[in-house]
Amino acid sequence: MSSEESGEVGVPKNGNQDDDSGSTRVSVSDRLAKLQRLKRKKQESEKLNKQELFQDYKQQKLKSIEYKKIEQKKLNAELEQEKLDSIEKGEDFERKQNWDWTIEDCEKWEKKTKQKGRNQKSGFQNFNKMAEQAYNKELSNLKVDKETYDQQKNAINKNKSGNQSQMSKILPVSSKPSAADTNRLVRNIEEANNRRMKRRRNKDDENDVNSYINDKNKQFNLKLNRQYDES
């Protein structure tokens, strides 16, 4: 076999390999393009399904609201008609209406009204209770100067002559607070203001954090922070 024959035979073989590789590349690219088209169609279909579900839910909700409005209007109309009938017959409508109430209904109504009244007063009661506790706490921290008290008491008894006017002249002068008492009052006010500002800053810091998983997680983390701050 000559070189020309071998060359003629070899060229077609190389050409066939190129054609095969090209067809392989084309088939892979076609498949990728087809997958991309299917993926887009799937996404569009899911989007349309969600929109249709939302529209259906919205329509059902609107129908439910309209149905409730119609039922309420119907009940009001029936109640008004019963009231007019009672007036024409000369009956007491309120008394007649109460006949349909059972003992359980009356107990539920009384319980509901009592709870409503407690809720309205709870805010003022809580604030008053907090103020009372703070006042008692400050009083418990005060130190009584018995020595000064005894001195003032002895001075009053020594100058006491049975005349109420003279006693009234002595008491205002003797009850003047000392510089130490005045400084202690100022210090207590400053400490109370600092505590109040600290609580406000802590509350602002808590509101700034939005990374809590849920309310239970928030309470747990705040409790840990308080323990670390106290330690």
Curated annotation (Swiss-Prot):
Keyword Transcription set for record: no
One of the GO biological process terms: mRNA processing
Family annotation (Pfam families): SYF2
Region (Disordered) location: 1-30, 144-231
GO (cellular component) term, any one: catalytic step 2 spliceosome
Signal peptide coordinates: none
Coiled-coil stretches noted in the UniProt entry, renumbered to this chain: 30-89
Composition-biased stretches (Polar residues): 151-168, 211-224
Cellular compartment(s): Nucleus
Assigned protein family: Belongs to the SYF2 family.
Reported function: Involved in pre-mRNA splicing.
Oligomeric and partner information: Associated with the spliceosome.
Protein name, UniProt field: Pre-mRNA-splicing factor SYF2
Organism: Debaryomyces hansenii (strain ATCC 36239 / CBS 767 / BCRC 21394 / JCM 1990 / NBRC 0083 / IGC 2968)
Lineage, opening ranks: Eukaryota, Fungi, Dikarya, Ascomycota, Saccharomycotina
